[in-house]
């Protein structure tokens, strides 16, 4: 389909004018800013039971140069090679092609091949959901970062489109990095993104659709005045990235946005104001800062309703609203968030609970999940969250299988009215369209130390809802419970038995349980003497292969009076997304089984507690594959 470049002179009454708009045409080359102009910018930037034996999990642990250093330091994405605590790479495993083929997911979004990382600029436009993503078109390892592009009618079935942006200008020649979309009231789309310049300086750039009437947004124009932002004095040239979606400021026609950075070891969110997205003013102070959290990247900032169950547009503010601040911590590759109050006039966000401040309190996901990004979906009035699920195997294994990383299933995000401290994340309702037939329903009484096989047609693609009722007499005896100060990550996994746990579900296991991934609850005695519930995912025996991540992930999760212990699991071959208590605590597992593959995968429920009986109620749906393929552009 031939498209024409959006012409502001003929559309001024409909769309926001962009200064110095290029003439019509497909991806026309932009004028390169002069060396003097670049120099000025750079000068400004300077200033169980017997079968579950106890095994310890493996632990994972600025000057210009001719080539960039490790991407975990300079590019703001995770180092790929999995390393142990000594820093040495693990020995590669002799993967068969059948094993590697089985690892590829059936209903999670991923490109046909090669490397992918952060989700970028998600939006809804003219009947289509758009997802852009960091992509290497040349290899299954990080490099040559380009913006991949895909569209969907339902967030589940996807169609690949041509690249939206490639690194072809001096200001993004070393990578078209992460960015966000802002949709103006008149429909114009402003896409701000970070570019890595020919001198390895992180700058912010503007792009916009060539033709807003095109539902697929096939062609994008880079503003010829790029970069629109360079690192301000006091900010490192490699510590200035990932602009957020903008929100309306206190003055009419004013927009605000935040960009992550650091000052020393303090993570900060800088705030800029603009009226046209081509010129910006850095506001005094910062939106928020937390000492000791290091570089903040992929910052997200959005409102949530404390009264209603719908999502809110990014600019919404007023009574009954809290604001979520999320930062992806470059130092440990974890996504942290906090809920607080935003003072628009003072440009300050304050956490409701300083002990749960951003970077030191709650995490969006306690597993392999990073660089998340939300957007407001006007079609269904919801806030939708994307996140990157990376790899923990070796680069050689990724090169052998020809791809690396997937995106999480999109999640809705709501404020948890019951706790007032947590968000509730839940898979978008469209995932249920993949359910095949009626669920398998089981109710199982589990005595201490017991395990039971649940027979399903295929254990590789499942949607599981499970609730557990613990013997009330045992719960009342919590004063006798052990493991005060229990932690999932240091507990020894599901093989570590206590009076009131662990109990839960075992997924992607083989018949002999030589490979298994338990997802479970563990009730311990808190520091106040009351029951404290933990939600964990144990990967210590998820694979017999060396050189892959085998941590125990998890955290505490509030279980309120009258609530059963409940979980939902989405199993998709080598990915398990686990949601506890309606999504208060979430864990994403990336596993690499060698035996529990194809028809050998099994599903179990278990109770490895020593002093409590548990009744498990389970619903299991088999899921069919999503349709993810190239868009038939020749049919347009």
From Swiss-Prot:
| PROSITE patterns tied to this protein | GLYCOSYL_HYDROL_F32
- Topological domain (Cytoplasmic) residues are 1-31
Signal peptide per UniProt: none
Identify the keywords attached in UniProt to this record, alphabetized.
Answer: Disulfide bond, Glycoprotein, Glycosidase, Hydrolase, Membrane, Signal-anchor, Transmembrane, Transmembrane helix, Vacuole, Zymogen
* Coarse class of the protein's main subcellular location: membrane
Reactions listed under catalytic activity: Hydrolysis of terminal non-reducing beta-D-fructofuranoside residues in beta-D-fructofuranosides
Instruction: List ligand-binding residues for substrate.
Output: 115-118, 134, 142, 177-178, 241-242, 297, 330
What are the disulfide bonds? 488-536
Question: Which Gene Ontology terms describe the biological processes this protein takes part in?
Answer: sucrose metabolic process
**Which regions span the lipid bilayer?**
32-52
Task: Identify the EC number(s).
Answer: 3.2.1.26
Q: In which pathway does it act?
A: Glycan biosynthesis; sucrose metabolism
Show the GO MF annotations. beta-fructofuranosidase activity
The residues on the Lumenal side of the membrane are 53-636
Q: How does it assemble?
A: May be present in two forms, a 70 kDa monomer and a heterodimer of the 30 kDa and 38 kDa subunits. The ratio of the levels of the two forms within cells appears to be regulated developmentally.
Into which family does the record put it?
Belongs to the glycosyl hydrolase 32 family.
Question: What name goes with this protein?
Answer: Acid beta-fructofuranosidase
């Amino acid at each position: 389909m031939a498209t024409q470049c959006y012409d502001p002179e003929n559309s001024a009454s409909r769309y926001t004018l962009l200064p110095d708009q290029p003439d019509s045409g497909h991806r026309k080359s932009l004028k390169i800013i002069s060396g003097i102009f670049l120099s000025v910018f750079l000068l400004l930037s300077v200033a169980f039971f017997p079968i579950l034996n106890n095994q310890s999990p493996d632990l994972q642990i600025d000057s210009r140069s001719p080539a960039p250093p490790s991407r975990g330091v300079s590019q703001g994405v995770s180092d790929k090679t999995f390393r142990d605590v000594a820093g040495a790479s693990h020995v590669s495993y002799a993967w068969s092609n059948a094993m590697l083929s089985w690892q590829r997911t059936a209903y999670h979004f991923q490109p046909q091949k090669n490397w992918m990382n952060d989700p970028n600029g998600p939006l809804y436009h003219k009947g289509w959901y758009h997802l852009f993503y960091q992509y290497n078109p040349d290899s299954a390892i990080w490099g040559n970062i380009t913006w991949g592009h895909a569209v969907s009618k339902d967030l589940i079935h996807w169609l690949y489109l041509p690249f939206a942006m490639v690194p072809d200008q001096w200001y993004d020649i070393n990578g078209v990095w992460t960015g966000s979309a802002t949709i103006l009231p008149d429909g114009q789309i402003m896409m701000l993104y970070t570019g890595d310049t020919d001198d390895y300086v992180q700058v912010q750039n503007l792009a916009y659709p060539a033709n807003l009437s095109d539902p697929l947004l096939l062609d994008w124009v880079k503003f010829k005045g790029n970069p629109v932002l360079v690192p301000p004095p006091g900010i490192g040239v490699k510590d200035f990235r990932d602009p957020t979606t903008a929100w309306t400021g206190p003055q009419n026609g004013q927009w605000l946005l935040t960009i992550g950075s650091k000052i020393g070891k303090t993570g900060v969110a800088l705030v800029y104001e603009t009226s046209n997205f081509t010129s910006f003013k850095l506001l005094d102070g910062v939106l928020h800062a937390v000492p000791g959290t290091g570089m903040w990247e992929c910052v997200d900032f959005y409102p949530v309703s404390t009264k209603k169950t719908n999502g809110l547009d990014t600019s919404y503010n007023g009574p009954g609203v809290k604001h979520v601040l999320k930062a992806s911590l470059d130092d440990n590759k974890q996504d942290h968030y906090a809920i607080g109050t935003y003072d628009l006039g003072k440009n300050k966000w304050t956490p409701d609970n300083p002990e749960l401040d951003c970077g030191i309190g709650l995490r969006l996901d306690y597993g392999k999940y990073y660089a998340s990004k939300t957007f407001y979906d006007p079609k269904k009035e919801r806030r939708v969250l994307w996140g990157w699920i990376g790899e923990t195997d070796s680069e050689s294994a990724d090169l052998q299988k020809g791809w690396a990383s997937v995106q999480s299933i999109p999640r809705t995000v709501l404020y948890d009215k019951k706790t007032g401290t947590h968000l509730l994340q839940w898979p978008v309702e469209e995932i249920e369209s993949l359910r095949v037939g009626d669920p398998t329903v089981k109710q199982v009484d589990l005595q201490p130390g017991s395990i039971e096989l649940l027979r399903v047609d295929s254990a590789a693609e499942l949607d599981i809802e499970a609730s557990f009722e613990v013997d009330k007499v045992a719960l009342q005896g919590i004063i006798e419970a052990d493991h005060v100060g229990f932690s999932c990550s240091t507990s020894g996994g599901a093989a570590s038995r206590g009076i009131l746990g662990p109990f839960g579900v075992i997924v992607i296991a083989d018949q002999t349980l030589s490979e298994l991934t338990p997802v479970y609850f563990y009730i311990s005695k808190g520091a106040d003497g009351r029951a404290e519930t933990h939600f964990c995912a144990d990967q210590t025996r998820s694979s017999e292969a060396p050189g892959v991540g085998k941590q125990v992930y998890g955290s505490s999760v509030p279980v309120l009076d009258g609530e059963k212990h409940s979980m939902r699991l989405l199993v998709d071959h080598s990915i398990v997304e686990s949601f506890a208590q309606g999504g208060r605590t979430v864990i994403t597992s990336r596993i690499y089984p060698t035996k529990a593959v194809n028809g050998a995968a099994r599903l179990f429920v278990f109770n490895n507690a020593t002093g409590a009986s548990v009744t498990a109620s389970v619903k299991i749906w088999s899921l069919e594959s999503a349709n993810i393929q190239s868009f038939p552009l020749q049919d347009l």
